[in-house]
Regions:
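Nuclease catalytic cores
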Residues: 3-51, 109-112, 268-277
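Hydrophobic (often cysteine-bearing) scaffold residues that line and stabilize catalytic clefts
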Residues: 31, 35, 39, 76, ...
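Hydrophobic/aromatic-lined pockets within catalytic cores
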Residues: 22, 44-51, 134, 148-151, ...
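Short amphipathic alpha-helical segments and their helix-coil junctions
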Residues: 1, 13-26, 143, 149-153, ...
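Metal-dependent nuclease catalytic regions and adjoining charged, substrate-binding loops involved
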Residues: 159-161, 172-308
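Short, solvent-exposed loop/turn segments at secondary-structure junctions
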Residues: 23, 115, 149-150, 191-195
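Non-catalytic protein-protein interaction segments used by genome-maintenance enzymes to assemble
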Residues: 105, 109-166, 171
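A non-catalytic, helix-rich entry segment at domain boundaries
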Residues: 41-118
Length: 308
């Protein structure tokens, strides 16, 4: 079970079946998601000591556009251009980003897939791939790089993250894989998707402060706490339900009810690709609309580009 699939399931069982049982996803991802992937690659290049942040922005943006161009898909190229424009709007600020935390071991591993099982879920293997794992103050930490919407409050995000399934699963994995260290939790590197400079060349030209753009903060995870126990129990309960839904779908084609709020897209003003499957006006096997899902927990291909 990919931990991401659990999140997809509780958001919409119908879309979960299309994505994780039929293994079909929309052919074109949204620009915001594409920009998030690009930002993720830039941070990893920089934090591994491969490139300066400015160099990483330049190299990754060029590569992103080149790969999109080679697909000969105008739609993919448009999305790639929007993602690169977003990075360019923040590149000057990204060049000023610094890691505020000192690491004994900056990178025990980077983008390394894992599998883990629990006695409570016999026969189920959970899969994940943390961004980076490092050691600070004799504790092992998952380092999560994340781009957020410009309107997202850092404090709100951090509070909501206390129940993110990924982070609790990664803490369990780190405890088993690195028993020589105590478990710290997750260190978040957050970036708001804001333009660094606005009204360029005008009287009211302004720049954002770095504190408006960036936020870096640790979230501790206590494996013996009631919170952690309940998060894991909740994830297990969802997986049991997932197994039931998949079995009924495979046996007699029973389609689970959708989350109708998702029919209008992210903000409700567009048609979600899966909606037309529900209305019978499109097919999940139409290759002009959907493509096969790629395994996001396979070893990283170092591009981040998904080609339909």
């Amino acid at each position: 079970v990919n931990v991401s699939s659990v999140q997809d399931f509780y958001q919409c069982p119908f879309r979960w079946v299309m994505k994780w049982v039929e293994n079909r996803v929309p052919k074109f991802e949204g620009p915001a998601l594409a920009e998030g992937k690009l930002l993720h690659l830039i941070f990893e290049d920089h934090l591994k000591g491969v490139l300066t942040m400015e160099e990483a922005c330049e190299v990754r943006c060029r590569e992103w556009l080149r790969l999109a161009r080679e697909t000969n898909e105008p739609g993919l190229m448009t999305i790639a251009q929007k993602a690169v424009t977003g990075i360019k709007d923040r590149q000057e600020a990204l060049a000023q980003w610094t890691d505020r935390y000192e690491w004994q071991i900056p990178a025990l591993e980077v983008e390394e897939p894992f599998e883990i099982a629990f006695d409570e879920m016999p026969g189920v293997i959970f899969r994940g791939r943390p961004d980076r794992v490092g050691v600070m103050d004799n504790e092992v930490w998952h380092i999560q790089n994340r781009g957020l919407a410009g309107s997202m409050n850092f404090g709100v995000y951090m509070e909501l993250a206390t129940r993110h399934y990924h982070e609790h699963l990664y803490a369990e994995q780190n405890a088993r894989k690195y028993p020589q260290y105590k478990v710290g939790g997750t260190l978040f590197n957050l970036v708001r998707k804001l333009k660094y400079r606005t009204n360029v060349g005008k009287k009211n030209e302004a720049v954002k402060t770095l504190d408006q753009m960036f936020f870096q903060h640790p979230m501790t995870i206590n494996l013996k706490s009631r919170l952690h126990t309940h998060v894991m129990q909740s994830m297990f309960a969802h997986v049991e339900r997932m197994q039931e839904v998949e079995a009924r779908y495979r046996e007699n084609g029973t389609i689970p009810p959708p989350n109708e709020k998702m029919n209008g897209g992210f903000v409700g003003n567009s048609i979600d690709p899966y909606f037309r499957i529900l209305t019978g006006t499109a097919s999940i096997y139409d290759n002009t609309l959907f493509k096969d899902r790629e395994d996001t927990y396979a070893p990283a291909d170092d591009t981040g580009i998904e080609v339909g």
